[in-house]
Amino acid sequence: MTLLSFGFSPVFFSVMAFCIISRSKFYPQRTRNKVIVLILLTFFICFLYPLTKVYLVGSYGIFDKFYLFCFISTLIAIAINVVILTINGAKNERN
């Protein structure tokens, strides 16, 4: 299994979830709290989504690099979400 086929779904879901949460009115205003929410959300989705998929389907064939792929997909999703956070921050400063 390649990293692209494994990590696309969790990265996509974490980026979409971060975009939806960042638009809500209950989203924290301080940058530190935003980063904490970003990291926790991304970690939760990128690790638990593949694990629940494995357990729900019933194929317990967790391959050798499963946790490495989870960690790498988490880092990729955090990087994409930080870029989104930076763009939104720059956009809010202009207004």
UniProtKB/Swiss-Prot annotation:
Residues spanning the membrane: 1-21, 35-55, 67-87
Keywords: Bacteriocin immunity, Cell inner membrane, Cell membrane, Membrane, Transmembrane, Transmembrane helix
Chloroplast listed as a keyword: no
Chief location bin: membrane
Highest taxon in the source lineage: Bacteria
Gene Ontology biological process terms from the UniProt entry: bacteriocin immunity
GO cellular component: plasma membrane
UniProt-annotated location(s): Cell inner membrane
Membrane topology: Multi-pass membrane protein
Function according to Swiss-Prot or TrEMBL: Protect the producing cell against microcin E492.
Similarity annotation: Belongs to the MceB microcin immunity protein family.
Name of the molecule in the record: Microcin E492 immunity protein
Organism: Klebsiella pneumoniae
